[in-house]
Design a protein with these regions (language model features):
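Conserved C-terminal active-site "lid" loop/helix of NAD(P)H-dependent oxidoreductases
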Residues: 205, 235-241, 255-287, 294-301
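N-terminal Rossmann NAD(P)H-binding glycine-rich loop of SDR-like oxidoreductase domains
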Residues: 6-26
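NAD(P)H-binding glycine-rich loop region in Rossmannoid oxidoreductase-like domains
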Residues: 39, 51-92
């Protein structure tokens, strides 16, 4: 765990960045950058001991930020719902601008995505596998571009960098498993790819906080590129069945080629450079349900 460092966290109100910023704030000077558009955003950061800074990364202007951060976790994104050129500028060009602005840092983490990978069927995807064109093409190719931009800047200016390809996060603040839980509770079908089982390696909040901080600590030049996921593989079919047992609801699956292809990451490199995750997926899913639906009595509590 970092101590007595000056840390910049972008996208600081998000479900990934906020828990990391909160964990670091007790022993570090943490600055949280976000657009702060929702009521209570600033107070949420302040209550966690985080210095809240209103800044929109899409502007590409970082002159208002200090340039002496010792560590940076860059999680702010354009999700790619609008103009593709804006998405590339925010996620690639402006990420490079921020990396250069923070070039004095001892470690910088660029948050990429596992969705850049082309689907390879029933096998785990390693960092060496090539990109494809998934359903959210704008977001994915902008992140591939961001990896290239940040790699060039890091190597040219010798800035220690880790690129994490985020695969499947979940916890009290949400994530794809939480979204599927809501669909189950409403009786809605869950769309899945027909090439079953739909394997993932979901990573719970406690673990992604630990491995996110570790990613800053091990940054180097040339950059490290690593899949960021849980150590255990579990299919959507299996984890939805488990959630269904806990809440007393039978999941309904709808298999269609129009659904997202499964994202099953190879975590060999992650285990080597970041370590193993600690929370078993069943324990993590139970915690998520208890946090998001305290009104529910889970199966073994009835």
């Amino acid at each position: 765990m970092l101590k007595r460092e000056k840390v910049l966290i972008t996208g600081a109100t998000g479900k990934i960045a906020f828990p990391i910023a909160r964990a670091l704030a007790a022993r570090n000077d943490v600055w949280g950058v976000a657009r702060l558009r929702k009521p209570g955003d600033r107070e949420m950061l302040a209550d966690a001991g985080i210095n809240a800074v209103r800044l929109d990364v899409s502007t590409g202007v970082f002159s208002s930020l200090p340039d002496d951060f010792t560590y940076v976790f860059h999680a702010a994104v354009d999700p790619g719902d609008g103009d593709w050129r804006r998405c590339v500028r925010t996620n690639a060009h402006n990420s490079g601008e921020l990396l250069y602005h923070c070039r004095k840092a001892k470690g910088f983490v660029y948050c990429s995505t596992g969705s850049i990978y082309a689907y390879q069927g029933q096998r785990a995807l390693s960092e060496a596998d090539g990109p494809g064109v998934p359903l959210r093409a704008n977001y994915s190719f902008s992140k591939a571009a961001g990896e290239a931009v940040c790699t060039w800047i890091a190597e040219h200016f010798e800035i220690p960098l880790t690129i994490i390809r985020i695969c499947s996060t979940y916890g009290p603040l949400g994530g794809a498993p939480a979204d599927r839980l809501e669909m189950m509770l409403k009786g809605n079908p869950i769309r899945l790819h027909p090439d079953k089982p739909n394997n993932y390696n979901p990573i719970y909040e406690d673990d992604y906080v630990e491995l996110g901080i570790r990613a800053m600590e091990i940054a180097q030049t040339p950059p490290i590129v690593v899949n960021w996921a849980g150590s255990e593989t579990v299919s959507v079919e299996d984890y939805c069945a488990y959630m269904g047992e806990l809440v007393g609801v039978e999941p309904i699956f709808e298999y269609t080629p129009e659904a997202h292809t499964p994202l099953w990451p190879d975590v060999t490199t992650m285990h080597e450079v970041l370590g193993h995750t600690r929370i078993h997926w069943r324990e993590g899913f139970r915690r998520m349900i208890e946090a998001r639906h305290p009104e529910l009595v889970l199966s073994d509590e009835r």
